[in-house]
A protein has these predicted regions:
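Fold-level signature of zinc-dependent metallopeptidase catalytic domains
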Residues: 154-210, 223-235
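Short pre-active-site segment immediately N-terminal to the catalytic Zn-binding motif
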Residues: 194, 291-312
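Active-site recognition of the HExxH zinc-binding catalytic motif
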Residues: 309-325
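C-terminal outer-membrane/trafficking sorting elements
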Residues: 6, 18, 433-444, 448-509
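Active-site-proximal segments of metallohydrolase catalytic domains
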Residues: 218-295
């Protein structure tokens, strides 16, 4: 083993603080948001991230009080770690289109790259932007980290698209309201008045649908007047191809009604014209369809007779992380679930840990599982069928907006109201089960080029950097809880950092 003197830089302060009451002014600048663009590339059973850029954008629409995500929702999660104090200062769960693509047959035979982008409040000092993916045991795993350096010359402030913003309904400041930015897809410049009317129709839909109707004053709706060259959107089955600003299309994964876009950077570029918590894309089409991804975007057509129900259904996905409650045995999306763990979505259960879901809403005389009969209409129980599966997955009530466009069930109502509250300027308590200890070993950035920052919970620890064959390449003495290790002389490749019986893989570029 080659012993090398490695430069260790004490970053000071103990391992990650878990208090949810983060002081915004201490860690963030009130000057907009930081956006990190990446590509997620992979196949059905593997993936990796490629960093694209940091963008400093003019608006931040989130709460300045509830900076730590009080929920445990999403297939993915972004964390912001203050690099000097190793403090968790922001987190948010989300879903991606890439994760759904991984369930398709195509993903078993080829690799694809999907655009992904996360926006966080603008850090005052150096901070790590960490991306995590939920594994099939229901636990988040760190898969990528990048150091944000405020003085880095390539942090761009360039705004690709600048368009007028139309205030559809504004009830208060961005930090105290749920901010929805509405984007037009397939509306030409001459059709902007029609788009504005469709935006008003969307607000009217929310104002008539509980629980949004009772909380309509907690929402802001703004629309970006961004025209497309041509009217309509792509319909691959009929070889209809339209030049639009967001490049949306039907037939996602060959499902006729599934309307999405892979051009997520363009979505974020247009949305950057206004503060937002949620992005809603209105499609200029009379065809039935839409799509929704938690804290990613919602999309629905504006001209179909079922548009009102689709608007609310898709927003249930995007805003509250609600799952589809219907069965669709032929859908590959059922592969997203592991039946020996609880789904992360609030409105599904495998009954593995029903007490952690909605057991408190079930009357003592209701059997679990609950027979799917008229006797139990309008009753909270556990009805088999949901999450595209016909067996071993259970939903709260027989009917719901997330199943068949009925009114939201009691569980979905409760979840939506909790998410609305978390977007306010009132501090929301984080669930105790989410205050689990952070990893006792953290290695950032990953991938790395010149150095890695190693955070441990024990000082004076002997550590090693190993190759994938287990051969020790470097021996390191960690004298502090936070240490910077220069690795510029290491060849490119994958390495394992080993200390106190724990290991972390990292990539040297």
């Amino acid at each position: 083993m080659k012993k090398t003197l490695v430069f260790l830089f004490a970053l000071a302060f103990p391992l990650l603080s878990r208090a949810q009451n983060i002081n915004f002014e201490q860690y963030f600048l009130d000057e907009g948001s930081l956006r990190m663009d990446v590509f997620q590339c992979g196949t059905s059973d593997s993936s990796h991230y490629v960093f694209e850029r940091f963008i400093l954008e003019p608006h931040f629409g989130g709460s300045k009080v509830n900076l730590i995500d009080p929920f445990n929702f999403g297939t993915n999660r972004v964390k912001v770690i203050d690099a000097q104090t190793n403090t968790l200062i922001y987190s948010r769960g989300y879903n991606t289109l890439f994760r759904e693509w991984q369930t398709t047959e195509e993903a078993t035979r080829m690799e694809r790259c999907y655009e992904e982008s996360v926006s966080v409040p603008l850090p005052r000092n150096e901070a790590y932007i960490i991306l995590e993916i939920r594994n099939f045991n229901g636990e988040f795993e760190e898969v990528f980290s990048k150091l944000y350096e405020p003085n880095e010359m390539f942090n761009t402030t360039e705004q690709r698209y600048v368009f007028p913003v139309y205030d559809v309904m504004v009830n208060g400041t961005p930090e105290s309201k749920v901010d929805i930015v509405i984007l037009p897809e397939g509306y030409t410049a001459d059709e902007m008045p029609q788009f504005q009317q469709h935006c008003q129709n969307l607000v009217n839909v929310f104002a008539q649908q509980e629980p949004f109707a009772s909380h309509i004053g907690d929402f802001n709706f703004r629309a970006v007047l961004a025209p497309s060259e041509e009217s309509g959107i792509d319909i691959p089955a009929s070889h209809t191809w339209v030049r639009t600003i967001l490049n949306a299309h039907f037939y996602t994964f060959y499902i006729d009604r599934y309307c999405t876009t892979r051009n997520y950077f363009s979505v974020k570029d247009v949305a950057a014209n206004a503060p937002y918590d949620q992005i809603y894309i209105l499609v200029n089409s009379n065809q039935y369809g839409g799509g929704g991804f938690y804290n990613f975007y919602s999309m629905s057509t504006a001209g179909n007779m079922s548009s009102s129900s689709v608007i609310v259904h898709e927003f249930g996905h995007a805003f509250a992380g609600l799952a589809d409650e219907y069965e669709e045995p032929d859908s590959p999306l059922g592969l997203l679930y592991t039946l020996n763990v609880e789904p992360w979505e609030a409105n599904l259960t495998t009954l593995v840990d029903f007490e952690s879901k909605w057991a408190d809403l079930v009357a003592p005389n209701i059997p679990i599982p609950t027979p799917n009969t008229n006797q139990y209409n309008n009753t909270v129980g556990a009805f088999e069928g949901g999450g595209y599966l016909t067996e071993d997955m259970y939903r709260p009530q027989r009917n719901c907006m997330m199943r068949n466009y009925a009114p939201f069930c009691a569980v979905c109502n409760r979840t939506i109201e909790a998410v609305i509250e978390a977007h306010s300027d009132v501090l929301v308590s984080v669930k105790p089960e989410l205050l689990l200890p952070e990893p006792s070993l953290r290695v950032c950035p990953n991938p790395a080029t010149d150095f890695i920052d190693v955070f441990v919970d024990q000082v004076d620890s002997q550590a090693e950097i190993l190759d994938l064959n287990g051969k020790a390449i470097l021996s390191v003495q960690l004298k502090d809880m936070a240490n910077r290790i220069v690795i510029s002389d290491l060849p490119q490749g994958v390495y394992v950092f080993h200390v106190n019986g724990e290991t972390k893989k990292f990539i040297k570029q």
